Amino acid sequence: MDLNLDAPHSMGTTIIGVTYNGGVVLGADSRTSTGMYVANRASDKITQLTDNVYVCRSGSAADSQVVSDYVRYFLHQHTIQHGQPATVKVSANLIRMLAYNNKNMLQTGLIVGGWDKYEGGKIYGIPLGGTVVEQPFAIGGSGSSYLYGFFDQAWKDNMTKEEAEQLVVKAVSLAIARDGASGGVVRTVIINSEGVTRNFYPGDKLQLWHEELEPQNSLLDILNAAGPEPMAM
């Protein structure tokens, strides 16, 4: 199989944003690929825009990075001019405007999440084309196709912070198990009135699904775990 190392860097990706009763939780995997080649196993796909607003990035790594950089700059100017941080809604609509005005060139889907004193915790999904949709939860990236049914069953309104983060970590680990373009570690960002908390979940601490093997220390351990019991002589 030939690898095209000149292919654009793509975050095949699973990104998630969830509201809870005091704020929002954002989550993402960490795999960045170039065609079939894994270019980065531990990339950070949750990018800070302001002190209280973050964005989850999927699609073309270059496109999503440049959009985030422009938005961060404009929001900084907004804060200087108005003397207060931009709201989550303002941040999301600025991304929507950039995505819509450049929709023929950009290949990126984004989830904006944050907390502000006017509306509390908010999640906005901004898919390809520049639509902006406020949602109680949003999922995106190639791994999202495996999660719609899961969220239909597992989502509930007015969750606690702990319940929301557990849901996000479980969902991303499920997508990693099923989606070849998602992988690596799970990162979460919790945003509420008290500030921002970042958490990191390494791959060997994630929940295993169905036929996945428990981690083994050696080839002998793997063979012993997979093989039948030896017959008595």
From Swiss-Prot:
EC number(s) from the headed UniProt entry: 3.4.25.1
PROSITE patterns membership: PROTEASOME_BETA_1, PROTEASOME_BETA_2
Main location group: cytoplasm
One Gene Ontology MF term: threonine-type endopeptidase activity
Propeptide: 1-12
Keyword Nucleus tagged: yes
Record CDD domains: proteasome_beta_type_6 (cd03762)
Enzyme class: hydrolase
Active site: T13
GO biological process: proteolysis involved in protein catabolic process
Superkingdom, taxonomy of origin: Eukaryota
Record keyword Protease present: yes
Subcellular location: Cytoplasm; Nucleus
One cellular component term from this protein's GO annotations in UniProt: nucleus
Reaction(s) this enzyme catalyzes, per UniProt: Cleavage of peptide bonds with very broad specificity
Gene3D superfamilies: Glutamine Phosphoribosylpyrophosphate, subunit 1, domain 1
Keywords noted in UniProt: Cytoplasm, Hydrolase, Nucleus, Protease, Proteasome, Threonine protease, Zymogen
Cystines in this chain: none
Record's function text: The proteasome is a multicatalytic proteinase complex which is characterized by its ability to cleave peptides with Arg, Phe, Tyr, Leu, and Glu adjacent to the leaving group at neutral or slightly basic pH. The proteasome has an ATP-dependent proteolytic activity.
Summary of subunit composition and partner proteins: Component of the 20S core complex of the 26S proteasome. The 26S proteasome is composed of a core protease (CP), known as the 20S proteasome, capped at one or both ends by the 19S regulatory particle (RP/PA700). The 20S proteasome core is composed of 28 subunits that are arranged in four stacked rings, resulting in a barrel-shaped structure. The two end rings are each formed by seven alpha subunits, and the two central rings are each formed by seven beta subunits. The catalytic chamber with the active sites is on the inside of the barrel.
Family from the record: Belongs to the peptidase T1B family.
Name of this chain's protein: Proteasome subunit beta type-6
Organism: Arabidopsis thaliana
Gene name linked to the record: PBA1
